[in-house]
């Protein structure tokens, strides 16, 4: 999914950048990119999930 932000008439570049950052944050694009940046084996995912559950329990 691509995020497009067009600079409006009489809008500063800083304001347009702020709107773009907000839209990227809301859509979760950056989080998805960071998650997929490196491949994680399913066994490692399960191990991390169980570790997180164990930490929440205590």
From Swiss-Prot:
Gene for this chain: rpsU
GO molecular function per UniProt: structural constituent of ribosome
Protein's recorded name: Small ribosomal subunit protein bS21
Amino acid composition bias (Basic and acidic residues), ranges on this chain: 32-43
Annotated organism of origin: Oceanobacillus iheyensis (strain DSM 14371 / CIP 107618 / JCM 11309 / KCTC 3954 / HTE831)
Similarity annotation: Belongs to the bacterial ribosomal protein bS21 family.
Source organism, top-level taxon: Bacteria
Keyword Amino-acid biosynthesis attached: no
Record lineage: Bacteria, Bacillati, Bacillota, Bacilli, Bacillales
Biased composition (Basic residues): 44-58
Region (Disordered): 25-58
């Amino acid at each position: 999914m691509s995020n497009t932000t067009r600079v409006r008439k009489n809008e500063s570049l800083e304001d347009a950048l702020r709107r773009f950052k907000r839209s990227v944050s809301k859509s979760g694009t950056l989080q998805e990119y960071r998650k997929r940046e490196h491949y994680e084996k399913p066994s490692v995912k399960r191990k991390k999930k169980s570790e997180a559950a164990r930490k929440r329990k205590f």
